[in-house]
Amino acid sequence: MEQQGKWIWLDRERHPLEQDCPVSIANPARPGNYCMAEFRRTYDFRWEAVSAKIRVSGDTVFRLLCNNRFVGVGPAAAGGDFGANLPMPRHFINEYEIDLSGVRVEFLAQVQIPGSALCDWSQGRGGFFLEAEILLEDGSRRRIGTGSDWEARRNGRYPAPDVYDQRLDGGPWEPAWEIDEPVWNLTPAPIPMLDFQTVQPLGAREFVVGAGEERVISVEFDRIYSACLRLYAEVTGPCEITASFRELDRADDFPEEIV
């Protein structure tokens, strides 16, 4: 069956510094090289959507949502505990089957260049690919995929690796650029796809911070995790949260993340 999706990225004329990236963190990024690109597309059907089979990949690291629900992250980490100096020989694709409802299907993807973990491995440039077969209530199937009809933007709220600042401008949406000479050779991953599970810290609890007050809360986990931080907060004004992470037997903190 003919491939439906095309590799897309930010427009190369408007974003010349956010095209290429190091193949691994062993190769330092150039100034202006870091980028959190976002891609979106809405599909409206006559009949209700029942389910979707999705094939998706991104370079270097991607996160996919459908109808505001988390689908997955990837690609499966092909690297190891070493620094790569050559582009990744194969780029793995993730495959998902998800249930749907309603006549509207919305995709949103975030793709980061360069990688930030030692096992992240790249072809040396940013890209995103998705194709899906959507089953409708009348029994018909619609095949869709990424192309120049998707929208793209560089989200300025991610100014640096591991930093998110809601106060910054997310940036305008613009037509995605369809990459004319893709460098990726997609292969089904021979290892399990990445997965998310919610892990509560030991002794997790709610707490209240008064206006103008600063509080420091320390929590521990039962072991080391590769994780992202999820916070639930109700605020009545500006609020800055700084989280730092360290191993229990180390005195120095890892880089901070501003939320």
Language model: regions and residue ranges:
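Extracellular/oxidizing-compartment recognition motifs
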Residues: 1-259
